[in-house]
Swiss-Prot record:
Catalytic residues (UniProt): D65 (proton donor/acceptor)
Protein family membership: Belongs to the methylglyoxal synthase family.
Protein name as annotated: Methylglyoxal synthase
PANTHER family according to UniProt: METHYLGLYOXAL SYNTHASE (PTHR30492:SF0)
GO molecular function: methylglyoxal synthase activity
SUPFAM superfamilies noted in UniProt: Methylglyoxal synthase-like
Example GO biological process: methylglyoxal biosynthetic process
Origin superkingdom: Bacteria
The protein's Enzyme Commission number: 4.2.3.3
Catalytic activity: dihydroxyacetone phosphate = methylglyoxal + phosphate
Amino acid sequence: MAGGKCLALIAHDQKKDDMAAFARANRDLLSRWKIVATGTTGGRVLDAAPDLDVTRLKSGPLGGDQQIGALISTGEVDALIFFVDPLTPMPHDVDVKALMRLAIVYDIPMALNHATAIKLLPTLEA
């Protein structure tokens, strides 16, 4: 991912509608970013805001969370917005925890819910 700032977008299944609505409502701010997203989330974001520059990776449980983690560790992702569903058990919960750990270790801005994402996004420089 050469050039430009990169924002990662991820949403658990029960939060994908929220992420699509977030992308639609914030398309102007998001259009300043290169976006990487897990597979299904990226598809939903593109459906909601087709003009955004979104690269879809694998689905989260199939390695997409780990792909984004790798991009964080190499400095290719500058911020993470991850709409987490805390009420549904996730079979790939260890991957999710590892991803959040990497965001903390590499000290990138991270929003885990809509309210934080709304506050964070305008403060980020693309």
